[in-house]
Amino acid sequence: MWFRQLALFRLPPDARPDLAKLEAGMEQHCFAPPSGLEWSSQGFVAPAGHAPDRLLHPLAGGALATLKREDKVLPAAVIRDVLESKVADIEAREARPVGRKEKRELKEQITDDLLPRAMTKTSRTRALLDVHAGWIMVDAAGQKAESMVSALREALPPFPARLPHTQLSPGSAMTGWLAGEVPDGFELDCDCELKSPGDDGATVRCSKQDLTAPEVRQHLDTGKVVTRLGLVWQERIRFVLTEQLELKRLQFLDVLEEQASQAGDDAPALFDATATLMLGELRHLVADLIAALGGEAER
């Protein structure tokens, strides 16, 4: 249930989505398995097993959404083996070579024949919609995070979520924190990554180290900048901040898990308590992090 990473998207104050309308739109984009000749498909599914009819699981000041994707897996080696067998059979029966164009057509035919019977790989991407504070927080990175926002946009256009921009770039801020003091509420953890400027610059990765040690700080003296930095927020959440303002290796510490467990042994109650607690904690963490980066920059 607990998110393991975080990609942030900003919702403008004057364009916070109506969750009821959004859920109605999501119902038009429910997940369905890929058909015979489709390579993949995606769509929304219920985030909570105990509420199978809800595509948006309501939380205090927000909701939880889940996007399911299914990709067919058809290894190139399988297609190649079948193709080689067919080519050999044709050449033996008809006593002629099989040309390049015919091989290409055979390959397409083989792919179409095998695709409906191919194995599938399933993935799920979850997002917290914090309409109270105006954030979409996705438990993914890169293209997967963008796919979630795009799917929400299709469900309720125009859904103007965008990447956030801060007064201080995460890279310059993290470099300053490693060289001096971290902002109130945060403390250095034990991992970081530093790079020399330029595309071909050297990279140094420190893991499970005291980041205040001279041998770590001396990399800053040679001109390297911090691209990833391990931080702990309020002794409650551990994470690695990246220069793209993504939170990796997100870990909710024992104090939060104990709070959630007080909801009891009932699975639905524990799910709701965990999701609500996670939304509230991430809401405050993101607010403190954006403030530590100088606040949001006007666009």
Describe each region flagged by the PLM.
Residues 1-135, 139-299:
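Intrinsically disordered, low-complexity, charge-rich terminal extensions
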